[in-house]
Amino acid sequence: VVLSLAGLAPLASAEEKPDEKRGWEFRVAPYFWFVSMDGNVTANGQKSDVDTDFRYVWDELNIAGMVTFDARKGNWGFLGDVIYADLGKSRSVGGIDIDPTVKVAWVSAGGFYRLGTWKLSDAAGKGVPAVTVDGLFGARYTHLKANLDIEGFANRSSNQDWLDPLVGARALFDLSKHWMLSLHGNVGGFGVGSDFTWETLCGIGYRFRLFSKENNARVVGGYRAVHQDYKDGSGNDKFEWDVTLHGPILGLLIEL
């Protein structure tokens, strides 16, 4: 139920040494997405609304894990994002045990090219404020598994998997030595997996020292939205996932 904080991960400072003098840089960021859902889902030909806020998702959550990472050398780099969530609580209705479960996995991977960095101030000797722009390309794999087990009745389950190509861009603003802003967007699907998918992310981060290296960690937060419109099958076998997931994000980015 809950994709890429990678839009925040590669917040490189304009004060750092030139790209040609750097080796590989690696960053990893565990995070949490306080997600809500809006849209509709069709399963076995039956359509239903899924307008759900984060409080309901939290109540139904069994386990979740989210991490993003990236690496860069010079102008080229690669990034990834992994999300897994297991939802559904057993309950008894009229003396009958009902066990619904939903498992969701998103795995995103791709690359980026640094188009350039431009200073936004003429202050002598200052590397900030500045803006860095990257072009993004990659793919997102989506796995959905729903299971409904009703005591005394047949178990019903549904599995869906698809892969969406993605293209996008991000702008990374170094506002000061410690503060930064990120704007990220991508589109994809194009009928390969989803008919269409899009993502937007706006975040702000604060750099600080962790262990012995200066400014090697950042607390990052913001707001993220992802839309997917995926269809498969027809008639009583039709499945459709026309859903927007959105909500605040909060994470800790660490340079390795």
Go through each PLM region and give its residues.
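Transmembrane beta-strands of outer-membrane beta-barrel pores
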Residues: F32-S36, K73-N75, V82-G88, W106, ...
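Transmembrane beta-strand segments that form the barrel wall of outer-membrane beta-barrel proteins
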Residues: M180-D195
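Short glycine/proline- and aromatic-enriched beta-strand/turn motifs that initiate or cap beta-hairpins
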Residues: S13-Y84, I249, E255
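Predominantly the C-terminal beta-signal and adjacent terminal strand-loop region
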Residues: T200-L256
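Residues that define the transmembrane beta-barrel architecture of outer-membrane proteins
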Residues: R22-W24, L61-G65, R72, K103-V107, ...
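Outer-membrane beta-barrel translocator domains and adjoining extracellular loop/strand segments
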Residues: G39-K47, S90-G95, A123-A124, K145-A154, ...
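Short loop/turn motifs that connect adjacent beta-strands in outer-membrane beta-barrel proteins
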Residues: E15-W24, G116-T132, L175-W179, R209-A217
